[in-house]
Amino acid sequence: MNKPFAAIRRSALALASTTLLLGSAFAQEPPAVDEAAFRSCLAQLQGSSAFRAVDAASFTRFTQGLAPDPSVLVLLDRQPEFTLPVWDYIAVLVDDERVADGRAAYAKWQDTLRRIEQQTGVAPNVVVGVWGVESNFGQNLGGRPLVQSLATLSCFGRRQAYFRGEFAAALRILQEGHIAPDKLVGSWAGAFGQTQFMPSTFFRSAVDFDGDGRRDIVDSVPDALASTAKFLQNAGYRRGEPWGFEVQLPPGFDTSDAGRKNRRPIDAWRRAGLTLADGSALPDTLPSAGLLIPARGRSAGGAGGLGPAFLVGRNFDTLYSYNASENYALAIAQLSNLVANPGAGVAFATPWPTDDPGLSRAQNRELQSLLLARGHDIGSADGMIGAKTREAIKTEQQRLGMKPDGRAGQKLLAALKR
């Protein structure tokens, strides 16, 4: 994945995570944009080299009457109000609901997934893990018209050159008939489909797996799953290798060399005293691995310890390449494990180093119901912790003598239930 793409995906991930976990939290007014300048920009783009694969008729057809969407410019420059602790991130992305839905999807599509594995080498549960984290198994595809968003970002704001490439690719998708115009919707940054591809990624990795002549990653689950596997295969996924596993560190272990990229042979980790989380010997399923400690240096609330630790291999890197975040990759990895292991619980063997763990979506809804019962105007109890919910949380935290940071955690939920 090229650096501009990774940077945009990283930015989009931060905001998408904020929207997913905290809801719509941005109240800033969008800037005014000059529609005449927008039309002039589109006219210049039509004849540029970046759009040489889009014919004049298609360009006109898909941009005629198009108006800019200034709200995407706010999102382009917006930073999350605060960084989510990893335990909050994982609590929402890998909760009982998503695991149950993932196991159902895994069972429903197992024949298709096995055929995809035969062709790409990517394990079925890993593909399902990506699907679950990216769109909640197709339930959250985003609702912004890609052509409008990408056209706006191509003409205003930062990184116009990058977005022009994505805009051209989006028009080409429509020109070739892979996706219907009304179905080409997604995130503000241009990601779309069941597993949220950028348009340029579509042309590198999208697959027509159902044989209908179109690479439809929006409405064709087989196409979307096969395309996801193709992306991971292109990123270097190794057939038959696990992404890694949770481990137990020996007392007093020096973690200064921890890091996903600091790989050592598995035997070296054995000699250093590491075991699997249950105390058994490390398996030989990975030739080498790096030590990932997501919460190192991030303990909270007086809790000690390092939290869960993992040895991760090359296949973890392919998950990281999908969205340039170790927490994101870990969410996929854990979800993929649970999908393939019925009966396993969502918690890691080692608890997170906090005395106030995060909430699942069901617990978020319970928290919101309690806030509604106390008279707070937060809309519905939908499990999305947005701006209104966070303001209500701050009010209740102040009343309860807690730090008014707007964070939804187990302590606040317990206090409101008393």
Give, region by region, the residue ranges found by the protein language model:
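Sec/Tat signal peptide C-region and signal peptidase I cleavage site
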Residues: 23-27
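Acidic, Ser/Thr/Pro/Gly-enriched interdomain connector segments
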Residues: 313-318, 322-325, 334-384
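An acidic, Gly/Ser/Thr/Pro-rich helix-cap/linker signature
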Residues: 28-120
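Bacterial N-terminal signal peptides that target proteins for export
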Residues: 2-15
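Short acidic, glycine/serine/threonine-rich helix-capping segments at coil-helix boundaries
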Residues: 357-364, 372-416
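Flexible, glycine-rich surface segments
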Residues: 181, 188-193, 198-321
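Sec-exported extracytoplasmic/periplasmic mature domains
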Residues: 43-59, 64-71, 114, 118-121, ...
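Acidic/His-rich structured neighborhood in mature extracellular/periplasmic domains
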Residues: 88-233, 243
